[in-house]
Amino acid sequence: MCSPLPLLILRLLLLTHPSLGRHLRHRESRKIHSVVVSTWNYTDANLQAWSVLKQGPRRTRQAVIQGCLACQNLRCGRLLGGSYGPDERGNLSLEAAIMDGRNQKFGAVAGMEGIRNAILVAEAVLQHTHHSLLVGKGATDFARVMGYKEEHAVNLNTKNVIGNWTFARCQPNFWRDVVPPPRTQCGPYSPLPQYLLQRPMRQEYPITQGEHDQLAFLALDSEGLIHVASYSSGARFRLRGRVGDSAVPGAGIYADNEVGGAIASGDGDVLMHHLPAFLAVEAMRAGQSPAKAAAKVIQRVLKHNTEFNGAVIAVNRWGTYAAACAGMDEFHFVVSGGKGFLRMARVERVKCQDRKDVVDGGPKGFFTRKPMKNRKIE
């Protein structure tokens, strides 16, 4: 027979602390709102992911995979899955990743040439290996073992893109501290002598609405299960062998069922410096709202990279979501589901933070220092 002592203690606590009872009732009654969130304004792909999620519980993995496949087939952002995003040598490659919020298991591929369905290969890494990331030829070999056929994707479009880029003196590119000067001339390049190295300056990778090389999806179901996924054709004119944020856990995607998840998009090399998706989830773990977590992450990135272009979307375990961004007037993302919404695949917009409100001088000194009386103390 159970002792009545624990029940008596609980009753005493409820009598002396009424707020505890309200808190417990709130926790018991709080509902998880299923939601699919994706970066940028591609509604069809988000709707396809939602159509999978609403079929029933435990469909989050297939939902985010379907979203990535839809964008690949629909050529979301023109660069994705097509022939318009080559590296500087004219090669086409893909990267993709998926993470399970139950245990943070992660599968990814990067720099994978000749294979079209990168997100399915990333899922195969998760399911059929003890590894987290396969790159380059090794990723292609693994895809063949998994039954995926190689395709020669380079075509006339790719050759035209490279031809126009070369005619424009290989601008933009991702070289620095080399000769000849990479901002005015094409390579081949060689390192500058040490005594000629200049103060580090970075030509920020531009982001234009409708011209994206990366997309990310988050799916949360009514049981609180979360999966996140990302898919990218890589920054145009990148160096061959470059790995982007899509394939790095915590940079483009991160999820923990106990807290929530986050997805990010923007300059991948900067995102890999700071792991904003991971930081957003940890901020929510510390008690911050999705809106506060996303804003704080963007502020942190800006303080170290004053010209950063990008965004992060944070979603807590209940389905509340928010986004923050920098480097654009506003950031668009698509949401299906969530609390109190009937219309699916709705495009939501968030006004981006003004750099000058965040950066006080900055490591590169792009902005005039604010007067001391106006400085915000955190």
Curated annotation (Swiss-Prot):
Key word Signal present: yes
Any one GO cellular component localisation term in the record: lysosome
Matching SUPFAM superfamilies: N-terminal nucleophile aminohydrolases (Ntn hydrolases) (SSF56235)
CDD domains under this entry?
Glycosylasparaginase (cd04513)
Q: Which Gene3D superfamilies match?
A: (Glycosyl)asparaginase (3.60.20.30)
Q: Which UniProt keywords apply?
A: Disulfide bond, Signal
Q: Which InterPro entries match?
A: Ntn_hydrolases_N (IPR029055), Peptidase_T2 (IPR000246)
Q: Does the keyword Signal apply?
A: yes
Q: Which Gene Ontology molecular function entries are recorded, alphabetically?
A: N4-(beta-N-acetylglucosaminyl)-L-asparaginase activity
- Disulfide pairs here are 71-76, 170-186, 325-352
| Name of this chain's protein | L-asparaginase-like protein GF11609
- Organism, scientific name: Drosophila ananassae
